[in-house]
């Protein structure tokens, strides 16, 4: 569960390391984001020669959360950290690689480009 002011790690090679959630998108009463939701983030730390700089505001997709998701077969999947992938205005990822694994629920939510860039799909 991600809410405003949550610090998240970036799991792609866009140049950002840490971001902070500043808005959860999706309606007036949508205050908590879960796996596969799009949020607005502010870049808190980045590498010097990255595609994004510190202080920029962009959209991000949540790909891993500590608070897990329950699947239809009853299994529960959790991760060790809260991670996002940065998106451009067209909804495509900034980076060309995604580190770590992503859940297969992202394919159902029409993020097949991110699933294809990932190292492993759980």
Swiss-Prot record:
PROSITE patterns: RIBOSOMAL_L14. This is Large ribosomal subunit protein uL14. HAMAP family: Ribosomal_uL14. One of its GO terms (biological process) is translation. The keyword Transport does not apply. It holds the Pfam family Ribosomal_L14. It comes from the Bacteria. Disulfide bonds: none annotated. It comes from Orientia tsutsugamushi (strain Ikeda) (Rickettsia tsutsugamushi).
